[in-house]
Amino acid sequence: TRLATTKAFWFEASDGEQVQAQLTLPPDAKTSKLPVIVMPHGGPNARDFVRFDPFVQTFANRGYAVLQVNFRGSSGFGKAYEAAGFKQWGGLMQEDVIDGFKQVVSDPNLNLDADRACVVGASYGGYVALTASFKNADLFQCFVSIAGISDIGSLLQSEFYTRMSETRAMNAARHGDPVVDRALLAGDSAINH
């Protein structure tokens, strides 16, 4: 079995920001339209790389195109890029993933099937899948959340009281304060939808 090739690219998000992503296509793609798996990374302060990923390769081997978006808030693209994701779990970070999906399925050269698409993710990526299920349900046929965060406020509340004060301050700046930002966190949590 041949490995699929992953190609990195940049696209323009709906608000004009440049966002990095990568697309993996099956090694023996046929002429028929390919189903798509959108696979956001965990973290969210992490990133995907163009390198061997057993999950991506397995999906590609089974005939799926796999899109991985390094949404704002991802590490490795500079401090400003990472900071642009602060308190944006269900906002700009989510929109970047959706914009990336819309970009690739609208490219006629890629031959992707927008009507056969799924979001699959773990940890923060699972959160993206859950959030897509209530914010973007019209775009996808399935949502798979593996250990995804369904209640951001609850997560931050538990970390707020169990971690050192420096970590609490960092979490409040990056993700939100469980008390001060309660409404924002509740609105972006799948448990409330």
Question: Where are the predicted features?
Answer:
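Short substrate-entry loop that stabilizes the transition state in hydrolases
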Residues: 29-34, 39-78, 152
